[in-house]
């Protein structure tokens, strides 16, 4: 069964910024996001023990230099995308979501 995707404003902003600076990376990140519809817990995903998003356990996957942070609502089959962070940025930024 396919999951729906729900994008936070921060994710939209990051995708827009990537579109202005690096179309190739934008495409790679967006394809990784789309793949979460079929498999929200791919083998390269990692559960984030210190982070919840809208009451759900957080996960992350990596695409190139970017970390895609999200949560999964199994009841409604929705992948809730919280942030896209460059690998150089600290996960402490997630405390401000």
Question: Language-model features: where?
Answer:
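Preference for short coil/turn "hinge" residues that link or interrupt alpha-helices
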Residues: 11, 41-44, 72, 84
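Enriched for short, Lys/Arg-rich terminal
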Residues: 18, 24, 58-67, 71-97
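Arg/Lys-rich, positively charged N-terminal/basic patches that mediate binding to nucleic acids
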Residues: 1-32
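Short acidic/His/Gly/Ser-rich catalytic and metal-binding motifs that mark active-site loops
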Residues: 4, 42, 91
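A short, surface-exposed loop/turn module that caps and links secondary-structure elements
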Residues: 34-62
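Active-site micro-motifs of SAM-dependent methyltransferase domains
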Residues: 13, 35, 86-89
